[in-house]
A protein has these predicted regions:
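Acidic donor-binding loop at a coil-to-helix junction in glycosyltransferase catalytic cores
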Residues: 167
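Active-site catalytic microenvironments for nucleophilic, acid-base chemistry
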Residues: 107-112, 138, 154, 175-182
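Acidic two-metal-ion nuclease catalytic site recognized across multiple nuclease folds
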Residues: 173-207
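Short alpha-helix plus adjacent loop in nuclease-associated cores
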Residues: 128-143
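Conserved non-catalytic scaffold segment of RNase H-like nuclease domains
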Residues: 1-110, 145-146, 150-163
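Substrate-recognition/cap helix-loop segment adjacent to the acidic, metal-dependent catalytic center
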Residues: 100-128
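Short Asp/Glu-rich motifs
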Residues: 71, 171-172
Length: 207
């Protein structure tokens, strides 16, 4: 079975091409395998009071507990290799990933390429990217909001502690499980969507 990883970043702002990652959380779906770390901003700039209010992450926390970005990225890279195992590909699931988290992830892998060389970084062409925001828009048309918090509320999923990366990951794991089940019912396939993530990717891309 292909490994499915739930991903969330907390960042210093909303620009995925410029802002800093300040927290990474990843979790293998239906498993206790997880990776999380705080990261000192790569730009060496302090995070704003607005970001602290939203996430609960302070500059003091980053200074005391945050890893330097190169160390954090390498640790994440090693963890991805370890959970991929013998599988040819890996699925990475995030909410609003296409416009945000997946862009940050590509930046991480690009930065790692400069440090480690292409032979050691996790191969991006082996990743199947699934954006639960796009999936929800296909499965639940005409909703007033597709924010993760709103969708979790729709499925009665606990969102306590939201806007810390691992808490968001745990909630998103449950949200994706519900969306998978809904897609199973809609497609009425003998082959379960949970065992064939390519079907989810193809469904999202259908016009």
């Amino acid at each position: 079975m292909i490994t499915k990883v739930i991903l969330d970043f907390e960042t210093s702002g909303l620009n995925p091409y410029h802002d800093d990652i300040i927290e990474i959380a990843m979790k293998v779906m239906d498993s206790d395998k997880q990776f999380t770390t705080l990261i000192k901003p790569k730009s060496n700039e302090c995070i704003s009071d607005e970001i602290t209010s939203l996430t609960g992450i302070t500059n003091e926390m980053l200074g005391k507990k945050g890893q330097f970005w190169g160390e954090a990225y390498q640790s994440m890279n090693e963890w991805l290799h370890s959970v991929r195992g013998d599988n040819d590909k890996i699925v990475i699931i995030s909410h609003n990933g296409e416009s945000f988290d997946f862009i940050f992830l590509r930046r991480i892998l690009n930065d790692l390429n400069k440090i480690l060389g292409c032979q050691n970084i996790f191969p991006i062409h082996k990743i199947i990217f699934i954006d639960t925001l796009l999936l929800a828009k296909r499965l639940l048309p005409r909703r007033y909001s597709y924010k993760q918090f709103s969708l979790c509320k729709f499925f009665n999923i606990n969102t306590e502690g939201c806007h810390r990366a691992m808490n968001d990951v745990i909630a998103l794991e449950k949200l994706y499980f519900n969306l998978e089940n809904k897609l199973d019912n809609e497609l009425d396939k003998r082959r379960k969507v949970s065992q064939n993530p390519e079907m989810v990717f193809d469904y999202i891309k259908l016009k």
